[in-house]
Amino acid sequence: MKINRVFSSVMALALTTTLAACGNSNDTNKDDNASNKTKEETSTTDEKSSTDINKDEDKGGSDTDKNEGDEEAIKDFENVTDDDTLVIGVDNLGGDFIQGYTNNTNDVKARRFMGIEGNNGFTTHYVDEAGQWHWNPATLEKEPKIVNNEDGSATVEYKLKKDLKWSDGEPITADDYLFGTLLESDSNFNTLTGSINIGADSLVGYNEFKKGTTDEFDGIEKLDDYSFKITIKADELPYFELPQLTVVGPSPMHYIAPNLSLADNGKSLKVKDGYKVTDEDKKDFAESVDNKIEKIKEEFDESYPEEPKEGSDERKEYDEALKEKDDQVKDLEDSKQGDIDPTRLLIDKASLFETEDYRLNPAVVCGPYKFDEYKNNMVKLSLNENYTGNFNGDKATIPHIIIQVINPNIAVDLLENGDIDIWEDEMKGGRIDQMKAAEQAGKIGLGQFERNGFGNITFLTDRGSTKYKEVRQAIAYLLDRNEFVTNYAGGYGVVTNGYYGLSQWMYKERGADLETKLTNYTLNTDKANELLDKTPYKYEKDGKTPWSIDKANEQFKGDVEGFDYYRYDENGNKLVVNQFGGDDSEITTLISNQLPVNAAQVGMEYNVQSGSLQTLLDYYNFPKDDPDYTAFNMGTGFAHPFDPWLHFSSEGPFNKTKVNDKKADEVTEALRRTDPDDKDGYLDKWEEFNEWYNDYLPEIPLYANQYHTGYTNRVKGFDIMTPEWHANDQINAMTLEK
């Protein structure tokens, strides 16, 4: 069972959900971050959620996206399709098949085929193609029973179907639904594994259990082999997306922890009756700990190949990371010392097995497909003969699936040639045009939907010059955002003004009303100048003489070359904004072409630097007190739950923009605490939140685009595509025409 949140660490930068080997619960993911990433966004993580990150950089290429050698690559491509194998092309794979580490979007795709997360596994609830929650009739005998307790908490009772099986034929029982929560909420789990899953923190008794001050987890209870209940904390309620707090999925206890069992009441783990811990168990545990220590040391050495100079900013960061590494290694070494309690040893052994073995080789699952192998940039899956079907009663029939890494530049060519069967979520205008031409020629099928998110410029709002709202607003007035729609999205998109996706149900119901209340930031240097006059940066270099737009106009000759009439504050600090973007990103290029020139005209020095994704994430996730960069080109994708409190409240665990604003605290708290039955009240608060966001501008929305998915003509039944619904969701209704 999983109802978890996650924390950030040096080892993990992205927002992710927790493991539920046959479907996840997403309390960890209170929102975007849950961020869903796309192939044109960064899909290597450490969202760090989705997520992270919930945020990743939007990347792009030229309009044609063809490079030298691509034509030869098309000719040399090895086709692995056959009558029984569906091949899905992706741009990369990471190889993490459980949550808690990286959250590569294509690893997630594989997990969803296997039911490790998503709608195909036997979770207690699922999300349909329209983004609506339902209890899962594939899993449960009847609708869950919810009791509101006198202390404000809520207890949910579940009764499972008795015919559910793991891929190895073992029955799925209540023990499997409680095991994951007990394991990942254990006091040793995070220190031992480095996972960013922190367990079921929305349940009663979590804090005491996580701290190790009690042996029992009060918020869960086993009723019989096929029934159990959970109790949500009073301070978590009300919560508008209540199913997010109550959704539960199973983990294969018999495979991950074969020598453990649940106590009769299901509130703790114990050594299985009749089993004696062996010397081999102790040896295996010690070896697992040693392997973990070695990986921690290797990761540190990779991050810091050279020791920074004393007194440098890099040295401070290095010393902090070194201490964290040494502390973690010490804790791991200590775990091997002395006489270890048998139960403790087996719990720790299971934690390491889940995160070191099962993570890379999920041999037992309960979704429509089971894991065969991951090598040569391909994940190979085979039909799970023990799968009983999804909530609609549909059951997959295609014998094999291959998820194959390909060059995105030639993806559409491979699709036309039949070398791959599916290419999903394309957002580049040039490739979309190519796909449309192929569809019109009868070569492929094509579907499209509005992106559930947007590309943006994200700010640090508590340091540097971007800590002033007027500076952020001025930057918005220095952009021609329509150019991003035209040149990046190829016209397949629109400019947006708030924290929403065009496909969200809230926007569909209230979007027209909301837009009348929001500022539509358009290129307007006069407005930008007025706003900057309200900031401390209203002087010339001497800190006394008022800065003059007339002088700026006299000195500006059409570009920043030779221009040196910038704004300063009274202490002689220049108005400078430094932005970091990806070095292979067309978005970075578009921003570089606009902002430095436009900003100079109003006295702002705007610099755009590019580099690797990892460098961008480091600057964004771990900013210095005096940061090198306070602006970043990123992308946001919405998942479940939609909970801006996580990202913009001063108490939010994923408040990467460093917002500390009373109004933000109020509107985000009010939104999440809306009663689930008060839909109109929620929409009112959603509008109020977006009005705050549009004014405060922790991010500047640049564009929201359309996604296009292509598939070969032999693929049948792929007739539902939405932001919530992809091939890995529709697979149970799909066939291959022979």
Describe the residue ranges of each PLM region.
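Append "and occasionally in soluble cytosolic enzymes with long acidic Gly/Pro-rich linkers
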Residues: 380, 467-596, 736-737
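Extracellular/periplasmic solute-recognition and catalytic clefts
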Residues: 91, 184, 190-202, 372-383, ...
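C-terminal motif of bacterial Sec signal peptides marking the signal peptidase cleavage site
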Residues: 18-21
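Aromatic- and charge-enriched surface segment that lines or borders ligand/interaction sites
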Residues: 142-196, 223, 229-231, 239, ...
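Detector for C-terminal structural segments
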Residues: 378, 478-515, 583, 587-597, ...
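Aromatic-rich, solvent-exposed beta-strand/loop patch
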Residues: 231-251, 271-408, 434-452, 564
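Short, well-ordered beta-strand elements
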Residues: 83-92, 155-158, 177, 228-229, ...
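N-terminal lobe/hinge region of extracytoplasmic solute-binding protein
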Residues: 86-151
